[in-house]
Every structure is written in C-alpha cells, then in structure tokens.
C-alpha cells in the first residue's frame, strides 16, 4: 500500500491543505479523517456534489458512473470514489464548474 500527498485547494472556501492519503482510501474519506470538510451527498459516485478537478497527478475513479467522458477528460473527479495513484493536486468544491 502506497501513501500519497494530496493537496486540496479552494480559494473560495479558504482550503489549502496537503493530506496523506493511502492508495486504497477515497479522497473524501481521507480529507474528513484529517479534519477537512468537503461537500458530498451520495458517497457512491452517482451524483456531482463532491466534484473536484485534478490539476496535477493521477487518480483512479473507475467506480464512478456520473461523469461523462468529456468531464473526465477535462480532469474532473468525484472525490467520494477517487483514489490517489500519485501525489496530486485537486481543486475541490467544483460542482458548479461541471456545467
């Protein structure tokens, strides 16, 4: 099991934090465990409440069913079902940017 440094950013919500996240832990869960509140609703990858956007690094979100190919290609992720696969940077609170 690998552990990665995940930087979570949201200028609007005053979030600039780097957390440790194992490669088998969802980003949302790791953030909550380390005291960072992020938006969520379904926790199943079936809505867009927890959407983020990866600006650096690799994420595995193969369990998601909501985002279309264009959104995934643009770097959007659902933090409730996304695992880090490298050190990465994720803009959080991005649901409004999806549309």
From Swiss-Prot:
Cofactor annotation: [2Fe-2S] cluster
Main location: plastid
Intracellular or extracellular location(s): Plastid, Chloroplast
Transport among keywords: yes
GO-annotated cellular components: chloroplast
Binding site residues for [2Fe-2S] cluster: 42, 47, 50, 80
Free-text cofactor note: Binds 1 [2Fe-2S] cluster.
Keyword Transport: yes
Key words, A-Z: 2Fe-2S, Chloroplast, Electron transport, Iron, Iron-sulfur, Metal-binding, Plastid, Transport
InterPro entries: 2Fe-2S_ferredoxin-like_sf, 2Fe-2S_ferredoxin-type, 2Fe2S_fd_BS, Beta-grasp_dom_sf, Fd_pln
Segments forming domain 2Fe-2S ferredoxin-type: 4-96
BP-aspect Gene Ontology terms: electron transport chain
Molecular function in Gene Ontology: 2 iron, 2 sulfur cluster binding; electron transfer activity; metal ion binding
Annotated NCBIfam families: fdx_plant
Complexes and interactors: Forms a complex with heterodimeric ferredoxin-thioredoxin reductase (FTR) and thioredoxin.
Family classification: Belongs to the 2Fe2S plant-type ferredoxin family.
Known role: Ferredoxins are iron-sulfur proteins that transfer electrons in a wide variety of metabolic reactions.
Record protein name field: Ferredoxin
Protein encoded by which gene: petF
């Amino acid at each position: 099991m690998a552990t990665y440094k995940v930087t979570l950013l949201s200028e609007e919500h005053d979030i600039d934090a780097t957390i440790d996240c194992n490669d088998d832990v969802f980003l949302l869960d790791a953030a909550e465990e380390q005291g960072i509140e992020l938006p969520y609703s379904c926790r199943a990858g079936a809505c867009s409440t927890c959407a983020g956007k990866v600006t650096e690094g690799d994420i595995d979100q193969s369990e998601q069913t909501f985002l279309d190919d264009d959104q995934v290609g643009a770097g959007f992720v659902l933090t409730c079902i996304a695992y880090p696969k490298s050190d990465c940077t994720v803009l959080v609170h991005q649901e409004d940017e999806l549309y």
